[in-house]
Curated annotation (Swiss-Prot):
Family: Belongs to the MnmA/TRMU family.
Spans through the membrane: none
Native species: Pseudomonas putida (strain ATCC 47054 / DSM 6125 / CFBP 8728 / NCIMB 11950 / KT2440)
Classification via Pfam families: tRNA_Me_trans, tRNA_Me_trans_C, tRNA_Me_trans_M
Name used for this protein in its record: tRNA-specific 2-thiouridylase MnmA
Class of this enzyme: transferase
Reactions catalysed according to its record: S-sulfanyl-L-cysteinyl-[protein] + uridine(34) in tRNA + AH2 + ATP = 2-thiouridine(34) in tRNA + L-cysteinyl-[protein] + A + AMP + diphosphate + H(+)
Length: 374
């Protein structure tokens, strides 16, 4: 199968997902310079935008429109709020109810940006879509591989690991070959309104609000005890859903008579007893795992795992590649690491790589401790 990207650019219509940020702005500009027929599309994925603390959807739309006006392309708008609620947000809440720490950006990419947006763009007559993600693609015969972005500080393949090769084949990633300072320099050179705009951080539907304040609107908090690894109760938590493995801030522990001055960290969430288990020190043994279990793994392209395979993995965004052996089990997958892994967190994603190729990944179900626990 010939990849759509191999067509003559002058005869190829590309719709760029315009977020109102500098990366998508420069992506559209670069595609114009490469000779593509370019249009933009701004997605609204969340309805509640009347509060000043919510992420600035109106400002983002205005910035996207200003950029499109500047470079001379049409901007479409689409509302995917219903799809986002059904396919991303409800799953996000269910995971927190189950005491896990989900990553909604990964589902958003799979269900919204590379499904709802892609389908909508194709219905408008597009041949391809494009986004401002820092990743690359490589066409190898009938398959299209997902590669890391060249800028190691901005590589976003971790967040795109659940997007299939067929969708990657329909997508261009113009800034994936660039480093962030180069992208900003291009935007400044061409007078784009987003040239100096700060990168968005956090989960879009939460914006600048405190996470705990947002979450309690949707889920009832269940306070419980905070215990040491020896079972001593040393405080109360407001709800396990507000805490994640390895967390240091916001525990409200201090001034204990027999404790050292070392900071406290979340080591474990005992869901059955609604207890938060904590310990002192950044290097506490309970923070480290030798292996993890993952349920279903989503592969970008088919992967043969008939026997254990040496790969690298990331258990969080921006982590350096960690050597591991991945094997099938009766109930899913098990990754055994060469080195101890800190704060492996159920609900987060583990993503596997073969060199620069992102193979895919899955949700972490459980971690196996590096050393035995009493």
């Amino acid at each position: 199968m010939t990849s759509p990207a191999l067509k003559d650019p002058a005869k190829t219509r590309v719709i760029v997902g315009m977020s109102g940020g500098v990366d998508s702005s420069v992506s559209a500009l670069l595609l114009i310079e490469q000779g593509y027929q370019v249009e933009g599309l701004f997605m609204k994925n969340w309805e509640e935008d009347d509060g000043t603390e919510y992420c600035t959807a109106r400002e983002d739309l205005a910035d996207a429109q200003a950029v499109c006006d500047r470079i001379g392309i049409k901007l479409h708008t689409a509302n995917f709020a219903a799809e986002y609620w059904d396919n991303v947000f409800e799953h996000f809440l269910e995971e927190y109810k189950a005491g896990r720490t989900p990553n909604p950006d990964i589902l958003c990419n799979r269900e919204i940006k590379f499904k709802a947006f892609l389908d909508y763009a194709l219905s408008l007559g597009a041949d391809l879509i494009a986004t401002g993600h820092y990743v690359r693609r490589r066409d190898t015969g009938a398959l299209t591989e997902l590669l890391k972005g060249l800028d190691p500080n901005k590589d976003q393949s971790y967040f795109l690991h659940a997007v299939g090769g067929q969708e990657i084949a329909r997508t261009l990633f113009p800034v994936g070959e660039l480093e962030k300072p180069e992208v900003r320099a291009i935007a400044e050179k061409h007078g784009l309104a987003t040239a100096k705009k700060k990168d968005s951080t956090g989960i879009c539907f939460i914006g600048e609000r405190r996470f705990s304040d947002f979450l309690k609107q949707y889920l009832p908090a269940q306070p419980g005890d905070i215990e040491t690894t020896e079972g001593e109760v040393i405080g109360r938590h407001h709800g396990l859903m507000y805490h994640t493995i390895g967390q240091r801030q916001g525990l409200g522990i201090g001034g204990l008579k027999d404790a050292s001055d070392e900071p406290w960290y979340v080591l474990h969430k005992d869901l059955a007893r609604n207890v938060l288990v904590v310990g002192q020190g950044n290097e506490h043994p309970w923070l480290f795992s030798r292996a993890l279990l993952a349920s279903e793994i989503f592969w970008v392209n088919p992967v043969d795992l008939g026997s254990p395979r040496q790969l690298t993995a990331k258990v969080r965004y921006r982590q350096s590649d960690q050597r591991c052996t991945l094997e099938r089990t009766a109930s899913g997958y098990r990754a055994v690491f060469d080195e101890p892994q800190r704060a492996v967190t159920p609900g987060q994603s583990v993503v596997f790589y073969d060199g620069e190729v992102c193979l895919g990944g899955g949700v972490i179900e459980a971690a196996e401790p590096w050393s035995p626990r009493a």
